[in-house]
C-alpha cells in the first residue's frame, strides 16, 4: 500500500471493500437438491493438497466446485464434465455464494461475498489482498472458518461518509 500525503487524501475513507456491499442486492436464498452445500474454490496448484484434504473432510456433504480464473473456451467442457461451475457472469458466482453454507477458497473475492451474505468462509492465500479482511474485523480468515459481525454498521458508516461528501 502506498502512503500518500494528506493533501492528496483529504476525502479518503479507510473502509471496507465494495464487495462487502453485495448483500444489498437482496439475492434470493434458493433451496436446491444440494442444499445445504459447501463450495470449494481452490485454483492455485500450490493449494491442491488442501483441496484434496477438504474433499475428504466433506465427502459426506454436498460439494460444489467453482472456478474464477479466466479460462479458454476449449477448457470449459473439461471443467463442466468434472462438475465445476464456470461462468462469464458474476451473478452466477454471487448466487452460488449467497446460498452456500460454507466456502473454502484461495480467492479473496470468493470469500468476501460469502461473508457479506452472512455465510461462513475460510481463505487459503497469502495475497496482499488479505488486508481487505482487516477493515472488516475478520483478520483470522486464514486460520479458521469465520463469519462477519457488524457488517451493517460498517456499511452505514461508509455510506454516511460518502453521503457527507455530496452535501
Regions found by a protein language model. Give the residues of each.
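Active-site anion-handling motifs in enzyme catalytic cores
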Residues: 1-167
Amino acid at each position: 500500500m502506498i502512503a500518500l500525503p494528506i493533501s492528496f487524501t483529504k476525502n479518503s475513507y479507510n473502509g471496507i471493500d465494495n464487495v462487502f456491499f453485495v448483500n444489498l442486492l437482496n439475492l434470493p436464498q434458493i433451496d436446491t437438491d444440494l442444499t445445504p452445500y459447501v463450495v470449494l474454490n481452490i485454483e492455485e496448484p500450490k493449494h491442491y493438497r488442501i483441496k484434496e484434504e477438504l474433499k475428504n473432510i466433506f465427502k459426506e456433504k454436498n460439494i460444489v466446485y467453482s472456478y474464477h480464473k479466466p479460462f479458454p473456451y476449449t477448457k470449459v467442457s473439461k471443467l463442466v464434465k468434472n462438475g465445476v461451475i464456470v461462468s462469464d457472469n458474476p451473478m452466477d458466482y454471487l448466487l452460488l455464494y449467497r446460498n452456500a453454507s460454507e466456502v473454502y477458497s484461495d480467492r479473496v473475492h470468493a470469500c468476501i461475498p460469502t461473508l457479506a451474505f452472512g455465510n461462513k468462509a475460510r481463505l487459503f492465500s497469502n495475497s496482499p489482498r488479505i488486508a481487505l479482511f482487516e477493515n472488516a474485523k475478520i483478520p483470522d480468515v486464514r486460520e479458521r472458518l469465520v463469519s462477519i459481525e457488524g457488517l451493517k454498521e460498517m456499511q452505514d458508516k461508509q455510506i454516511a461518509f460518502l453521503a457527507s461528501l455530496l452535501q
